[in-house]
């Protein structure tokens, strides 16, 4: 399932996430890019003078990333269990369009929290499954069926409320989840930032 990462991304959506990421990560920070895929966002961070480490479970996107960006520190990890990264070793963790694919959300969030330093920032994006989006899909049965096709690798679906509650439940504070992108009811993203508690 993970090897099927598309070659290209929606440029508007990618730009939205890039701007969000750069607004939260200062130059000189050490950032972990979780689910780095082909290294697009890791490369953006590196150009912004950020020390970045990218990890992914999929071999093929990482192979392409290493060809395009040989200067980046990109590593393949197992999908479950602890990552070979030191505790509290990153100022920020970025996980763009990843959380919806994770089977063990509790274990995954625990790993994100473990590698974040005290007070570090978690940044993530995921599709917005708010009420207007669901209504739009309900009015277009083919679109609804395609989105929730069991062969699609989205395992979880989030709204602003459910994502906020999830992050707060894992001890993150200053949680800010915003819906961004097209007009309400169109394809939108949740952009979330949260701080790791100091204890």
Segments from the language model and where they lie:
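A short glycine-rich, Lys/Arg-flanked "PGG" loop and its adjoining helix->strand segment in the class I
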Residues: 106-118
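A generic structural signal for alpha->beta connector loops
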Residues: 49, 71, 119, 171-174
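A short His-aromatic
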Residues: 97-101
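Conserved N-terminal segment of class I S-adenosyl-L-methionine
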Residues: 1-86, 92-96, 109, 139, ...
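Short glycine-centered segments of the SAM/dcSAM-binding site in methyltransferase folds
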Residues: 30, 119-121
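Short N-terminal helix/helix-N-cap motif within the alpha/beta-hydrolase-1
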Residues: 60, 103-107, 134
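A short hydrophobic/small-residue beta-strand
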Residues: 52, 122-123
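Conserved class I S-adenosyl-L-methionine
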Residues: 123-145
